[in-house]
Each structure stands twice: as structure tokens, then as C-alpha cells.
Amino acid sequence: EKRPKYVLLENVDRLIRSPAKQSGRDFSIILRCLYEKGYAVEWRVINAADYGYAQRRRRTFIMAYHNQTEIFCNLAEAVCVQGLKSMHKHVMENGILAKAFPVQSHSRSYVESWIDELEYADISTVSRNQRVYLYNAGVMMNGRIYSVDVTPQRIEATPLKDMLETGPVDEHYFLRTEDMPRWTYSKGAKREKRQRRDGSQYCFS
């Protein structure tokens, strides 16, 4: 089975803590699936506004790399030699997400765990019993998990007014008079009898 070298996933910020009654269940299922397919994983909850964008949008980014990649091999070797220290440095400085979105500090509390310590027969058992608390950043290498809360190196957000164009509006943004009937029909209410390929009729609205 051919697998991609790199996987980038994006989801809502609450993914790491969902669902409320089984905190972390959904995210731990994702980690388990990627681990079983031979991937190392790093994740971060990122607010676009913290890095200068004119939008307050928090999203969870999951970056996975397969065990055939150079970055996987380098991290695996570092973890073997330095243990948690290298995992912490990966989250804070060396990771793909840390390089793209720098952080300035971290919480004192952290989570260390092994995904293999969670014993279950299959994914359905995880869905019923899994409950784990993880922070807004972390890394998993060969089933070993390290997670910590990080504070971003904030860049002053760009006000929306600075992004709006104030000059003349190009003509191609306006509807032409001759196109109005087609737009009126497309956007307006309708109830038309149409025919399927098998000859039966249906009402299109």
C-alpha cells in the first residue's frame, strides 16, 4: 500500500478537547490511526490573528510525516538520544509548525504518554472508553506523546480597513445589463417539470 510522505490536516480548534464527555477521544483516534500507518505527528492550535492576519480564526493543524522521510528519521534519532528534551525542542523550535509559526514561551505543565499504554481491541473500544487531556501543541514519535501549551510570537494584526481597496472598482465586478435576465432566472424561485434519463419526471425548484 502506497502512502503519502506527508499529510497536512486542518480542523476546528476544539478538536483536541472534543467531545466534552470524553475529552480528547476524537483527537486520540486520529493519532492512533496515523501511528498505525507509520507516521510521526505534530500539532498546533493556531489563531490567524496572532500572526498578523485580519481574522480571528483558531484552527487545529496536524502535520504528519511517514517513517520513510528524512524528518521522521532525524526526529526518531533525536528522541532516542535526548528523549523528551528533543520532543520539547521540536515543538518549540525545530518542528515544521514551529518554524512556520514561531512561539515565545510554554506552560510549566505538560503531558507525556505512550499511545500503546492505551489498551483496547479496536477503534470502537477507543470510541467508548478513550479520554485523554492534551494541550494546544505537541508531537508524537513512535507512539510516544509529548504535549504542552505554547504562547505564539505575536505579530500585530492587520486591520481590515488596511486591506480594503479604496480605488475605482473594475468593471468586471458589475453585472452587464444583457446578463440580468439569466441571473434573475438562476437566482429566482422556480418550479419546473424536468425529465430524468429513465424518462420519469420530477419537479425542479
Task: Report each predicted region and the residues it spans.
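Class I S-adenosyl-L-methionine
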Residues: E1-F204
